[in-house]
Swiss-Prot record:
This is Spindlin-3. Residues 129-178 are annotated as: Tudor-like domain 2. The gene is SPIN3. Interacts with C11orf84/SPINDOC. GO terms for molecular function: histone H3K4me3 reader activity; methylated histone binding. The record marks 169, 176, 180 as: Histone H3K4me3 and H3R8me2a binding. It comes from the Eukaryota. Exhibits H3K4me3-binding activity. Belongs to the SPIN/STSY family. It comes from Homo sapiens (Human). One of its GO terms (biological process) is gamete generation. Residues 138, 246-248 are annotated as: Histone H3K4me3 and H3R8me2a binding.
Length: 258
């Protein structure tokens, strides 16, 4: 698992750090916005770039300028300046304000949008979403490690890929899981917690935390703030969070507190 933009040593995202599938966060009222990184002034509305291939430069502080190419997966409705991106050669999904973040330079929208592909097994795809799984990864030394996680959804735009997160690393990843399943590298678990979603009456509205500002207390006593940007349809208690100081998308089963 790799991380762009030099966030981890040697370009690798650690698969050994402890993570939490269920955390307690505090809903907060948003004060005057405080950005760790400066943003460009807003300009005239731009065309829709969801589904487009892009490339741009990236320079954070004194680090050297690097070049990145990827696919824009989504524009976040509760923060339209924020885009979800899958960069070539990297497994995480990233959240960036492409038109505002001053670390992004020379943004170019490449010709031709990403063409949709046919799912090889729609039945398996439907069964897989919302399920606990064991995902097998091969290390550079050739040994295999099993990672328990949850398949969250079929990814937008790149529709043969799936969103997934892991108990020990609660960040949003995406893989071609149907291929992994057929190769024996993905096993769907028979988990007692994977009960069908509760039936809802027609027109019933389920409370959502999407758009809420959150404050997360870390083990060292420090706090970080962010926004809930998405609710997982297959598991309504599970949400995507974009923290102000990070471009990863975090996935938590939220416990609402006052």
């Amino acid at each position: 698992m790799k991380t762009p933009f030099g966030k981890a040593a040697a370009g690798q995202r650690s698969r050994t750090g402890a993570g939490h599938g269920s955390v307690s966060v505090t809903m907060i009222k948003r004060k005057a916005a405080h950005k760790k990184h400066r943003s460009r002034p807003t300009s005239q509305p731009r065309g829709n770039i969801v589904g487009c291939r892009i490339q741009h430069g990236w320079k954070d502080g004194d680090e050297p300028l690097t070049q990145w190419k990827g696919t824009v997966l989504d524009q976040v409705p509760v923060n339209p300046s924020l885009y979800l991106i899958k960069y070539d050669g990297f497994d995480c999904v990233y959240g960036l304000e492409l038109h505002r973040d001053e670390r992004v330079s020379s943004l170019e929208v490449l010709p031709n949008r990403v063409a949709s592909s046919r799912i090889s097994d729609t039945h398996l795809a439907e069964i897989m979403v919302g399920k606990a799984v064991e995902h097998i990864f091969e290390t550079e030394e050739g040994s295999k490690n099993e990672w328990r996680g949850m398949v969250l959804a079929q990814a937008p735009v790149m529709n043969t890929w799936f969103y997934i997160t892991y108990e020990k690393d609660p960040v949003l990843y995406m893989y071609q899981l149907l291929d992994d399943y057929k190769d024996g590298d993905l096993r769907i678990l028979q988990d007692s917690n994977d009960s069908p979603l509760a039936e809802r009456e027609p027109g019933e509205v389920i409370d959502s935390l999407v758009g809420k500002q959150v404050e997360y207390a870390k083990d060292d006593g420090s706090k970080r703030t962010g926004m809930v940007i998405h609710q997982v349809e297959a598991k309504p208690s599970v949400y995507f969070i974009k923290f102000d100081d990070d471009f990863h998308i975090y996935v938590y089963d939220l416990v609402k507190t006052s």
